[in-house]
Every structure is written in structure tokens, then in C-alpha cells.
Amino acid sequence: MQQVLRQEIWGRLNERNQHFMAVLVGPEGSGKSYTSLKIAELVDPTFTAERVMFNPADFLEQLQEWKAAGETKGKMVVVDEAGVGIGTRSWYEKDQIKLNKVLQVIRDENMGIIFTVPSLKDLDSQARRRLRAYCEMV
């Protein structure tokens, strides 16, 4: 399983000039965060805790820094409990609008993003349409 995940996701980011967006869904304590961190570490050997984001503003700020330094290709990012920062109820907020614009063009950056949420409904509909993988934790 590890080899398949690494080969498929790493290949998308580093060989096929694509992005990767996934979501891990499940109740509190189901292992979403741990699993997302392990996947990110497996795919991207340079992954560190500094690439775990908890709100859109942090993610947007960090993305701008990576883009300016030309350091986006192949990077994995975990947006933990994404529903708190980018849920459907905040669709009209300034950060939400900015984040949706970033998600529209993120494919050009060849990055991997893993969201964790309690329910898929907690993730904005625009983000859901861009997902490449869905995993439900029980």
C-alpha cells in the first residue's frame, strides 16, 4: 500500500506535472490527522510539521512564500480540520474567496494537499470538486 501511494501521488507531483488534493473524513479520534501526516511524510521526504496548516490565512501566506522561492513542486501540505477554516458557512469571507482562487490554480504549482474534516459537507464545494482522493476513517 505504501509503495502504491508513494508511486501514484509522487508521480503526479513530480513526473506528470499535476497536483494532488485529498480529503480524510471521520469523527474525532478516528486517526485523520495521523494518517494525513504519514501520507505526507511518505510522499514528500522533506515534509515537516511546519507544513501543517490550521486556517486559510496561514496557508495562503505560506504558499506565497514558497512560490516566491520557487519551492512548490512536489511539496505536501496538510490542512488539518479544514472545515473549521474553510467550511461551507464561510464561503463569502475574504480568506475563503482567496483560498478558492488559489485552489483553482494550485495545479500549476504541482503540490499535494490533504484536508482533514469531520464530514465532507464541512469542506467548501469548490474544494470538493478539485479532490482526487477521498478516504473515510471509521
Pin down the residues of each PLM region.
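Hydrophobic positions on the alpha1 helix immediately C-terminal to the Walker A/P-loop
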Residues: 35
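A short helix-turn-beta junction within AAA+ P-loop NTPase domains corresponding to the substrate/partner-engaging
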Residues: 125-138
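Conserved nucleotide-sensing/catalytic segment adjacent to the nucleotide-binding pocket
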Residues: 49-115
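The conserved Walker
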Residues: 27-28, 91
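Hydrophobic anchor at the beta1->P-loop junction of P-loop NTPases
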Residues: 22-24
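Active-site signature of alpha/beta-hydrolase-fold catalytic machinery across serine-
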Residues: 38, 42
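Conserved lysine of the Walker
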Residues: 32
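N-terminal pre-Walker A segment at the start of P-loop NTPase domains
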Residues: 1-17
